[in-house]
Structures are given as C-alpha cells and as structure tokens.
C-alpha cells in the first residue's frame, strides 16, 4: 500500500509511538514462533524477546571449511561501522574511551545507540532520560551522551550515526515510573488502551514481561511518534545518520489487533503479509522523506534480518525462526529499491551463519545481487576465538562488493582485545566513508 493510501486510512487516529517487545506467548509453539536475532544478539547484557532463539537454526554440525585466496587489499573508500549498544557506556569517560579505541583501530562510523525502549540517551522533548544512566527514569544525568559522542567522534574523524530501537517500548514486568516527559507506555495506555501494542494470532495483546514489549507498526500514532523522535534528534544534534534496529514485526503471527484488522479490511483485504510489510515500509519511507531533508547529506541505515528469503532450506518454519521478508514483514530490499534507505547492515551471525564461512559468503552475495545501487554493510559479530574468522569475513565482504562492514559490537571487540588486530590487519590503512552519489 502506498504511503499516501496509508495516511488516508490512518486519518483521524491519534498519533502515537511505540517500541515495545511483547508478552510471553500463551503456548510453547507461539513462543518458538517469535525467534529473533538483532544487532544486540549474544551480548551478556542483552535480553531477548519472549521465545527468542539465540541465532538461526542449523541442521547439524557445520563441517570445517578451508578458504584460499580471500585476502583483499583494503579499499580507500569503505564503511567501517561499529555498533555501540547503550549498555556500552554509563559515563562521559566511557564515551571518550569508546571513540578513542574505535579511532585507533581505523573504524570510521559509530552506530551509537540513543534509544532503547521508549527512553532517551539525549535531551528529548518526547521521551524521558533512561534510568540506566542514573537509576531513575527521567532524571538528567548531568551530561548528554549523544552530544558528547558527536563532539568526540567528529574530533577524531569519525561519523556518528544515532542508533534507534524502533518498536521496542519497555522492558520488564514493572511499569515505567512517573517522569517528565511521560513515558509512552503510560501516555499511550491512557489514550489507546492496549490497542497500540502488538497482538498475537489469538487476538491477545502483549503485556509487560521480563523482556521487550513491542508496539504495533500499523497504529498511526506509533508511526507518528517514532517519526517525531527521529525528527527531534536530527533537528537538535549534528548526527551524520540515523540507524534503525527492530524495524520489523515481532513474528509471523503478530499483530492481529483491532486497529490492524480494521485498517486491513478497509483496504479491501488481500494478502495480509504484503499489507504488514507496507506498514513497516511506511515508517521507513516517512523517516527518509520527512526527517533526512532536515540535515542534507545524512544517511539512513538499518540493521536487518540475515536471511531475506530462505532459498536454501536453512529455516525450519514453525520450529525455530523465520526469514525477514515472510516472518518479520521486513522488506529491506524493497527499501533499497524504492530509494528510502541508504544502506542496510544484514546481521550475518547466529548459529546458522556464525560458524559457516560458506553460508556467510552465500548471504553476502545474495544481498549484493539486489542492492539496487544503494549500499550493503556486512554485519559481522566479533565473538570469535580467533580474529582470523573476523578478518576472513571482512575479506569475503570486500570480494563480494560490499561497501563496508558493521562490527558487533564495541563491548565484544573490547572484551576480546581485538583493537590491535583490526589496526594491524584488515583496517591497517584508513578509509573514507563511501560517498552516496544519489544524495
């Protein structure tokens, strides 16, 4: 459905925001259907969604592989992004250390997380300061993480992209405390009841649980709120880009809520999967069309599911996890084709990919075939016992023609002590961030 049609259908519905995980599924089968891998996968502090699998499935042990001739000279133009999740820092000194170490290893982009679950790591008029910084939701920590990160990154010659969790909205069984501004959980519940969150196929709404709660991509107020949050960041901070994560539904059997049912029927029915993909793409398109022009030249990117469509039988439907297009209604290649995304970072890790160079290479090549003149940064997890595994994947991505890599994550690289290996190996020569000639 076009963005114009969506706006017409959504007219009169109050604008709202969301980024909630979801209620633990009512049955083991439904829990399994919610399998997820995200940019934050495998970090010890990361909390998965209910029923979420740690990675993608394998059908048995993956044989050892030998690769020859994968060495590749470092290009002069290459994106070298580093995911910096919000748990990587609590103090100004932490941020300075992050920038210093990344710069020393010749990274050139920091994907710096500033929104986790309806909270903020910057001065926001829409959402309260995160309680991770002070212990109290809404309390000013005495410094501004995003402002400092931008200042330090730019001084060191790095780009700073504000990294935003899109649909997760709260975390834990205890509701957010009172704050100024009021958290979206309380505000939206007061305005819309439970119809702004995702519902399962039994028409049961998500509720507070020990993991993420997730907002309804089809609720116009959710879309409006997320667009407003992104606009607020871009208008007030000198960011070089916006980076989206969790920009998808929570699984193939969400969201069967009254708002979605009504809007879907209003358009005359049809294929519900196509309609759900259009809801997510609507948000992406609005951010690109309405927010990016406020800061000309900035980039929009997203961490996306590692398997777009399962052409190889690697996904066992109904038992573990799904492909991005059909299981999470994330049409990332459609965004590239429509010109509403500058680069994607497929998260090429998880159990089905992590230990297989062949599968990594297959997926990288598959994404490059349909990149439509936009850019692909291969997402590589740093949690390998040997740095040679990371270097091999960087070289495979280069050979496939990827414009860059995104390494997950600062805390993993730091824990492994791989900074010197990056600097002495694949990132020995500094590189410029690739130009975006369509800008």
Predicted feature residues:
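Substrate-binding cleft of secreted/luminal carbohydrate-active enzymes
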Residues: 329-356, 366-439
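Aromatic-lined carbohydrate-binding/catalytic grooves of carbohydrate-active enzymes
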Residues: 105-141
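Catalytic domains of carbohydrate-active enzymes, especially glycoside hydrolases
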Residues: 94-120, 236-241, 334, 338-344, ...
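Aromatic-lined carbohydrate-recognition surfaces of secreted/lumenal glycan-active proteins
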Residues: 159-167, 171, 243-250, 274-328, ...
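Aromatic- and acidic-residue-enriched segments that line the glycan-binding/catalytic groove
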Residues: 122-134, 168-208, 247-268, 313-322
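Aromatic- and glycine-enriched glycan-recognition loops and surfaces
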Residues: 88-105, 132-156, 225, 278-289
